[in-house]
UniProtKB/Swiss-Prot annotation:
Species: Bradyrhizobium sp. (strain ORS 278)
HAMAP family: Pterin_4_alpha (MF_00434)
Protein name as catalogued: Putative pterin-4-alpha-carbinolamine dehydratase
Lineage: Bacteria, Pseudomonadati, Pseudomonadota, Alphaproteobacteria, Hyphomicrobiales
Keyword Glycosyltransferase: no
Superkingdom to which the source organism belongs: Bacteria
Family matches, as SUPFAM superfamilies: PCD-like
Family as reported in the entry's similarity comment: Belongs to the pterin-4-alpha-carbinolamine dehydratase family.
Length: 100
């Protein structure tokens, strides 16, 4: 089982993740991605889903038109782990590739 990150480790990791923040009232990180249109948003979700399935680590997310709201936490660990940080980095890279 992966270990939950300390508050200091979470803060350090978040400094390198643009747009990500700790979620109020819960040990999780969140970000809202905004794309040009629904097709880009859905394409982002599809690409992330393939990575998430391969890693067996899935986001909580919500899509409305061109936005995708994401929450990451590792339920088995009761908080944020390196699995979440790594998935956040992958999401950032995918979003950057789509937005060009």
């Amino acid at each position: 089982m992966v270990e939950r990150l300390s508050a200091e480790a979470r803060a350090s990791a978040l400094r390198d993740l643009s747009g990500w923040a700790e979620l109020d009232g819960r040990e999780a990180i969140s970000r809202t991605f905004t794309f040009r249109d629904f097709n880009e948003a859905f394409g982002f979700m599809t690409r992330v889903a393939l990575i998430a399935e391969k890693r067996d680590h899935h986001p909580e997310w919500r899509n409305v038109y061109r936005t995708v709201e994401v929450v990451l936490a590792t339920h088995d660990a009761g908080g944020v782990t390196m699995l979440d940080i790594e998935l956040a980095r992958a999401m950032d890279a995918i979003a950057a590739a789509i937005s060009g």
